[in-house]
Swiss-Prot record:
Species of origin: Homo sapiens (Human)
Domain of life: Eukaryota
Disulfide pairings: 41-67, 43-83
Residues binding heparin, per UniProt: 92-98
UniProt-recorded name of the protein: Platelet factor 4
UniProt entry tagged with the keyword RNA-binding: no
């Protein structure tokens, strides 16, 4: 028997306590990650095929440690959120007008 197995066998209460605390530690780590924000790009796929009249709001997420490129997320009238292509001429024009106002 290995020393770790022998230790666990001789301390079942400690093993039980460790198993009880494990979900708490995982939950705490997950909550901390959510607090810091997701460290990944939200927009994996973008589109330039959305008409402006279908958009109710726009959200721009700047490039940073979470993602190397800026992201433009549109909320549509049906509630769906999609990522728009920042390089599309139409969206560049919209962003320019938003920044000017």
């Amino acid at each position: 028997m290995s020393s770790a197995a022998g230790f666990c066998a001789s301390r079942p209460g400690l093993l039980f306590l460790g198993l009880l605390l494990l979900p708490l530690v995982v939950a705490f780590a997950s909550a901390e990650a959510e607090e810091d924000g997701d460290l990944q790009c939200l927009c994996v796929k973008t589109t330039s095929q959305v008409r402006p009249r279908h958009i109710t709001s726009l959200e721009v997420i700047k490039a940073g440690p979470h993602c190397p490129t800026a992201q433009l997320i549109a909320t549509l009238k049906n509630g769906r959120k999609i990522c728009l292509d920042l390089q599309a001429p139409l969206y560049k024009k919209i962003i320019k007008k938003l920044l000017e106002s």
